[in-house]
A protein has these predicted regions:
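Repetitive helical segments and hydrophobic/amphipathic motifs
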Residues: 12-15
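Surface-exposed, glycine- and small/polar-enriched segments that build interaction surfaces at terminal
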Residues: 23-154
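N-terminal signal peptide c-region/cleavage motif recognized by signal peptidases
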Residues: 18-20
Length: 154
């Protein structure tokens, strides 16, 4: 094995061991599916999440094919699909969907359903709480828009 792979394996093992030392706080999660992970789907992760499909509330860097969160979450998510109830931070993916977003979504399709502050950059950007096209500019642009869209709290 080369040095980089050995270092990565060591870091993952150290994170797993350390995460069990702090009661109530988990710094690392590895997940194949919400029911098949190191930690229960209701356990908050504060650190790093690596997933095929993960669904934990988190304040972390989430890297996976599908990153889902229930409840309040924050951080940076890199995935093919990112979805959340309430998210504060950055979402990078093909499809990003958040019920309440306070942050930025970068992706082909971005959806932010709530009335929070959010910026979107992508092919199709949807913010249904923006009721009319350019009626409240510069605080909001449109219900849907190509290239970019946003909503700023008043």
């Amino acid at each position: 094995m080369n040095k980089t792979i050995k270092t990565l394996i060591f870091c993952v093992i150290a994170c797993v061991i350390t995460s069990t030392a702090f009661a109530g706080t988990k710094v690392f999660n590895l997940s194949a599916a919400p029911g098949l992970a190191l930690h229960d789907r209701n356990q908050k992760i504060e650190g790093l999440t690596l997933s095929l499909w993960g669904e934990n509330p988190q304040t972390s860097l989430a890297i996976g094919f599908v990153n889902g969160t229930a409840g309040n979450s924050a951080g940076v998510s890199f995935g093919l699909i990112n979805y959340s109830d309430t998210y504060k931070g950055l979402q990078f993916g093909f499809l990003n969907s958040s019920k309440k977003l306070k942050g930025v979504q970068f992706g082909a399709i971005n959806i932010a359903k709530g009335k929070k502050t959010g910026f979107q950059v992508g092919f199709l950007n949807v913010i249904p709480s923006n009721k009319k096209w350019f009626s409240n500019f510069p605080n909001e642009i449109a219900p849907f828009m190509i290239i970019f869209n946003w909503r700023l709290e008043k």
